[in-house]
A protein has these predicted regions:
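N-terminal prosegments of processed precursors
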Residues: 19-149, 276-278
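Fold-level signature of zinc-dependent metallopeptidase catalytic domains
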Residues: 22-34, 154-313
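Exoplasmic/lumenal beta-rich domain surfaces
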Residues: 251, 457-527, 600, 607-609, ...
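The catalytic-center signature of Zn2+-dependent metalloproteases
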Residues: 253-277, 317-394, 459, 463-474
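Proline/serine/threonine-rich low-complexity linkers at boundaries of modular beta-sandwich domains
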Residues: 408-425, 561-570, 668-671
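Extracellular acidic, Ser/Thr/Pro-rich low-complexity tracts
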Residues: 434, 445-450, 462, 539, ...
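Structural beta-strand segments of beta-rich domains
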Residues: 438-442, 585-589, 685-689
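Pro/Thr/Ser/Gly-rich low-complexity, intrinsically disordered linker/stalk tracts
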Residues: 669-696
């Protein structure tokens, strides 16, 4: 049973009273809702909020930016999973080529930049059938809006958290199908893992099986708009990833309407049980119906079967191979966030030049750089063994970005447009040597001439040499991935392992939500080894198809952490229990130096800081630099707390430790100003003074 969370507000002030925002209201109905059939899919979330939309009013605001009719931008409001409305500044972001867009002016796509949350970006698709959205968040789950009621008047708002193993889907694209030139180029030092200050646009030929068309109610060519609206919904979300990570946008060509089919007995594709034939059947169809000169990448959507295959990897622009990829769901619902992001973006990612990044199997491509199943788009999160999570996160791994950018730069078919948005400048990060079994933090920095809202993503960049049970993170792992990828955040700092793990006094992190029990996703090394890391910075600029054209840009920097077993673990030894210390008192902090003053770590001094919120932040610097000799007397601030922690960190290095337990600081009473001062028995030589005593003085 799905758990419906209805959000009722006691006061309506969250809903700004401007007329343009009256198209949303919280659903307060008590009757049974006849739901849209997509709600029945296994991957539909268990927790969501419901809102009623006035599509005519919303359309009026959206269409103000169509073809620059009234303005290049406009501000709209959308509900979020907290039950509030937030504002976005939108621009047109058409997924159709000019000919197709002119034929179907009621089917549109938009991008939006967050105003309420400046780090949020929006992708929104519109048609007479309703809207769908995807909101990219920083450091937390993305959010979606999809129709909930059959008449598309009630919408569900939910986060991108999906349940594990409910969709038995498999990508059968073999790693061996990688074009040799890509494999060679991506291993060279001159890799391209950044945007070049431009936008790349490619022509997409999208075919669909009759079963796909029928699912959306189209049984003849007179209903092609229903199919195009569905394709537009999916492509809007997919382009959101391509634009943000690759500075790439796919445009659906008008000739795609010639390869949309409605009758299963006469379409050119086998039934789903024989979908292995679809690669060849699609390629033959596109070659004969559309012509190789008229598209850059071709793909097929099915409705059932639970599979995907790109045909080959990196073969965009290559005649006779570029149109052989397909995606089809296992639950009979070719729509929704699972289908759009986990499957379609994955398969087209192969066609663009990306291999699988998981490491539970080593495909020999040099890019199996994720722990276990992997968690980024080109991984297999939630559908294989050694699952680190129940579902993927909505980004490409840094090595995928490098593969695809390298491949696209070698192709002539993408149209390259110079844009006004500049690429972020990422500052170089030094290499470090650290002791074994000791937490560390990597800190980056970047600037952006346009003032864009930058996000940061630290990822390990080591190819796996072990598989199966040895593919997960381990303290004794000598090579390969030991650190899970996470969503980009607004902070340039990443703690290794996660701060929650460090505060629990642990050196390893278990699986994310929905991952397999026992799978380790992060591990501090207890052996000597080398760890390569890449920091990818995204500027999160939104794509605009109308002048001035714009798209997001990325930049990166690499660094190396060397772990040595000649020192460590470096640990705080006192306080390490729930002691109670008085404010303003002098206390002795101790730590295990563990050989860290000697080469190659060579840490001469440490910094000691205090947290009063359980170790989440350390704003109080007790001593900025003191010899790394294992003991230092400090004076505590007179701040009452029951959640104090001590942090001892290397000066000029990246390693540190935090005390294992919260401790208490009791504030000493301070003397107040006395009151009631009076003089009595005054003589030439003396006087008696009296006043009211101050409690605790």
């Amino acid at each position: 049973m799905k758990k419906l969370l209805l959000f009722f507000l006691a006061i309506p002030v969250l809903f700004t009273a401007t007329a343009q925002q009256n198209y949303w209201s919280q659903y307060v109905g008590t009757g049974k809702i006849i739901t849209d059939k997509s709600v029945a899919r296994l991957s539909f979330p268990k927790e969501f909020k419901l809102f009623t939309a006035s599509l005519p009013l919303l359309k009026q605001e959206l269409f103000k930016v169509v073809n620059n009719n009234a303005a290049h931008t406009n501000i709209i409001s959308l509900p979020n999973t907290d039950g509030a409305l937030e504002e976005f500044e939108i621009v047109e972001a058409s997924n159709f080529d000019a000919e197709l867009q002119a034929q179907f002016p009621e089917i549109r796509a938009f991008s939006g930049k967050g105003i309420t949350d400046k780090y949020a970006t929006l992708k929104l698709s519109y048609s007479p059938q309703g809207i769908q959205t995807m909101v990219f968040r920083s450091g937390k789950e993305n959010e979606f809006i999809e129709p909930y009621s059959q008449d598309h008047s009630v919408y569900a708002v939910f986060k991108s958290h999906r349940n594990k193993a409910q969709l038995p889907w498999s990508c059968t694209t073999p790693g061996a199908d990688l074009e040799e030139s890509i494999n060679i180029q991506v291993q060279n030092s001159g890799i391209v893992a950044r945007s070049g200050g431009n936008l790349k646009t490619m022509r997409l030929a999208q075919s669909v099986t009759a079963e796909y068309s029928n699912y959306f109610g189209a049984t003849s060519a007179t209903q092609v708009s229903l199919v195009l609206a569905a394709i537009n919904n999916t492509l809007t979300r997919c382009n959101g990833v391509y634009e943000k990570d690759l500075a790439l946008h796919l445009n659906l060509i008008a000739a795609s309407t010639n390869v949309i089919y409605y009758n299963a007995s006469s379409d050119p594709y086998s039934n789903a049980a024989q979908m292995a034939n679809w690669n060849t059947q699609l390629q033959n169809t596109l070659t004969s119906v559309i012509g190789e000169a008229n598209y850059d990448v071709g793909h097929l959507f099915g409705a059932t079967g639970g599979g995907g295959n790109a045909g080959c990897i990196g073969c965009v622009c290559t005649n006779g191979a570029k149109g052989s990829g397909y995606t089809s769901p296992s639950d009979g619902v070719p729509a929704g966030d699972n289908f759009d992001i986990d499957y379609v973006v994955h398969e087209i990612g192969h066609q663009l030049g990306g291999n699988h990044t998981f490491s539970m199997i080593n495909e020999g491509t040099g890019v199996n750089k994720e722990v276990g199943s992997g968690i980024t788009i080109m991984g297999y999160a939630g559908i294989t063994s050694y699952d680190v999570s129940g579902h993927s996160i909505d980004i490409y791994h840094e090595t995928t970005i490098a593969q695809i950018q390298t491949n696209l730069n070698s192709k002539s078919c993408p149209v390259t447009t110079t844009i006004v948005n500049t690429t972020p400048v990422v500052n170089a990060v030094s290499n470090y040597t650290i002791p074994i079994s000791t937490p560390f933090a990597l800190t980056g920095s970047a600037t952006d001439a346009d003032g864009d809202a930058l996000t940061y993503c630290w990822e390990q960049n080591d190819n796996s040499t072990t598989t199966n049970a040895q593919s997960v993170a381990s303290p004794t792992k000598l090579t390969g991935p030991n650190w899970l990828s996470f969503r980009p955040t607004i902070s340039p700092v990443r703690y290794f392992p996660r701060l929650q793990t460090i505060l629990a006094g642990l050196n390893t992190t278990g699986p994310m939500v929905g991952g397999d029990a026992g799978v380790v996703t992060e591990a501090l090394s207890s052996v000597s080894r080398t760890l390569n890391f890449r920091l990818t910075v995204r500027d999160n600029a939104v794509f605009s198809s109308s002048a001035p054209v714009s798209v997001g840009q990325t930049q990166f920097t690499d660094m190396v952490v060397t772990v040595t077993n000649t020192s460590g673990p470096f640990t705080v030894t006192s306080p390490n229990t729930n002691v109670s210390w008085a404010g303003n008192s002098a206390q002795n902090i101790t730590w295990n130096v563990a050989g860290t003053t000697a080469s190659p770590v060579s840490c001469a001094n440490v910094k000691i800081s205090l947290s009063t919120d359980g170790g989440l932040t350390f704003p109080a610097v007790l001593i900025a630099s003191t010899p790394n000799d294992g003991s230092q007397s400090i004076t505590l601030p007179n701040t009452a707390t029951t959640t104090a922690r001590i942090k001892v960190e290397a000066v000029g290095n990246i390693f540190f430790d935090i005390s294992n337990s919260n401790f208490t600081i009791t504030a000493s009473a301070s003397c107040g100003t006395p009151t009631g001062l009076a003089e009595n028995n005054i003589t030439i030589n003396s006087a008696d003074l009296s006043w009211n005593a101050v409690a605790g003085a």
